[in-house]
Amino acid sequence: MANSPAAPAPTTTTGGDSRRRLSASIEAICKRRFRRNSKGGGRSDMVKPFNIINFSTQDKNSSCCCFTKFQIVKLLLFILLSATLFTIIYSPEAYHHSLSHSSSRWIWRRQDPRYFSDLDINWDDVTKTLENIEEGRTIGVLNFDSNEIQRWREVSKSKDNGDEEKVVVLNLDYADKNVTWDALYPEWIDEEQETEVPVCPNIPNIKVPTRRLDLIVVKLPCRKEGNWSRDVGRLHLQLAAATVAASAKGFFRGHVFFVSRCFPIPNLFRCKDLVSRRGDVWLYKPNLDTLRDKLQLPVGSCELSLPLGIQDRPSLGNPKREAYATILHSAHVYVCGAIAAAQSIRQSGSTRDLVILVDDNISGYHRSGLEAAGWQIRTIQRIRNPKAEKDAYNEWNYSKFRLWQLTDYDKIIFIDADLLILRNIDFLFSMPEISATGNNGTLFNSGVMVIEPCNCTFQLLMEHINEIESYNGGDQGYLNEVFTWWHRIPKHMNFLKHFWIGDEDDAKRKKTELFGAEPPVLYVLHYLGMKPWLCYRDYDCNFNSDIFVEFATDIAHRKWWMVHDAMPQELHQFCYLRSKQKAQLEYDRRQAEAANYADGHWKIRVKDPRFKICIDKLCNWKSMLRHWGESNWTDYESFVPTPPAITVDRRSSLPGHNL
């Protein structure tokens, strides 16, 4: 129980062992003496089990063995009773409150290390932070020891000279030891409920006091040397604090006060609700409606936050303040993918704004194509990943943090530029930050995620950029370290084009059927591996690579090209292939032929019209194969002239913004 330091387990000793050590004859003497006193109505103290004072009044004719039998039992009971009273008198405040203010059971156990914080509180910071509160000072305290609770009493009295007790000790039972982070965030759950109904582990609810609290104060554990953001005790305490705060009646909004080295859960206690921070002290005044909605969510990804079958619920927000967004940084090869993604969103029936973040490396020509597809251009300054090597693929992917600066929107559905929206997903705007599908382990996939733009969240991400380690070196890993309390949406809303090594034939068949289903069953199809527009349309070129073959499927490949063909003709040019890419495709095909890959895709004759279209100065791509891999000179932009921007109808577009 939080607020419940160690208490020794009582050991009850009976007289059974003593009786076994007595001889039968002595036992008989004692029994006869006991019956004689009972019949004679003599000294009644002989049969009173708790009469442990007047030893001298015992019958002097009794055998010493009788004294041994009964008086030792009495002595042991006296010791037990004394120990119990001592424990009650000197126990932590949590027990006194439990005994006097609730029917909670006594909990004889050591403090759970998951809830323990060794932080020395800076009471000067506490006092100065409390100056931001004008309301009364009835304080609910959680997870403090008895000395700290006494200090809270002193703090409350320093502002109020009344005699009324201003501190209420809150009780919270610990979560069971088997409630681990992996149990709360399993890698897989049976979303379709084919064999079982996913159920989250039970976490004890806090008992909400009947008395109104102006301030809820909580001491949070933070083990900086470990995986502090994935801590069951830390999560449990914050959910308990949110529960008490959300229980306020009427229009009253209390404050929540954390003492912790580490920042609270940013999508539970939002930085926009942060009133003050001093050192390890955090004071919030949360929006209670928002808090109540979030408390209706499952405690982890162990259950779907948006069950299958109820995806048609409308968003309650303002559609003009909701948008789809993606980002391109230094990667013109994804322009075609972003254009196709925009086309798929419009085909799904959504009319929400489309916002794309680009940096200065995206040319005016490519910007014109994006605008023609419906994207509103926002120019950004790139953010370098400080842990990435120069020119590495992940060098600039922290630029994704700029999404939180889109504060002219309340909700953003971020989508990667390599996916298609097959069915309308506007209902996801009703979901909180961060809502996403599972990836591996306890992590979410950031390819589709709901976020709530806020400048202070952006600042939070930037403040820890040198401190937080990304598991994969990229933005997805970083965001998973910050937003550990994420909410699972069905995998059909970000279905990966991928056949796992462990997939059996039946699983592969089901996936293939999903890829090609008409009308679509999947909401979003996410193209991993070599992208469709970088292959010829004749077949999925992932088949020609032993590295990428797990991403190969002609069915999903054709699905993408159907969307491409529905795009305005003027946008097709943004999907043309450079000569170097044609050389790469031929190189992979020859490798597959040499290895005699059984699928036989390397035998298919290419009929894609783009095969004969040259957009650079290196049209003889076959000559490149003679020197393949020798140098990188074919990447020079001088070999790829930039065409003039196409004409765009801007009547339906908003002015661009810079971030």
Curated annotation (Swiss-Prot):
Membrane topology designation: Single-pass type II membrane protein
Pfam families for the chain: Glyco_transf_8
EC number: 2.4.1.-
SUPFAM superfamilies for this protein: Nucleotide-diphospho-sugar transferases
Gene knockout outcome: No visible phenotype under normal growth conditions, but mutant plants show reduced xylan substitution.
Transmembrane segments: 70-90
Superkingdom of this protein's organism: Eukaryota
Entry keyword set: Cell wall biogenesis/degradation, Glycosyltransferase, Golgi apparatus, Manganese, Membrane, Metal-binding, Signal-anchor, Transferase, Transmembrane, Transmembrane helix
Subcellular localization, as worded in the UniProt entry: Golgi apparatus membrane
InterPro entries attached to this UniProt entry: Glyco_trans_8, GNT1/Glycosyltrans_8, Nucleotide-diphossugar_trans
Region Disordered, annotated ranges: 1-20
Positions with biased composition (Low complexity): 1-14
Gene Ontology cellular-component terms listed: Golgi apparatus; Golgi membrane
GO molecular function list: glucuronosyltransferase activity; glucuronoxylan glucuronosyltransferase activity; metal ion binding
Free-text function comment from the UniProt entry: Glycosyltransferase required for the addition of both glucuronic acid and 4-O-methylglucuronic acid branches to xylan in stem cell walls. In association with GUX2, is responsible for almost all of the substitutions of the xylan backbone in stem glucuronoxylan.
The name this protein goes by in its record: UDP-glucuronate:xylan alpha-glucuronosyltransferase 1
Species this protein is from: Arabidopsis thaliana
Gene for this chain: GUX1
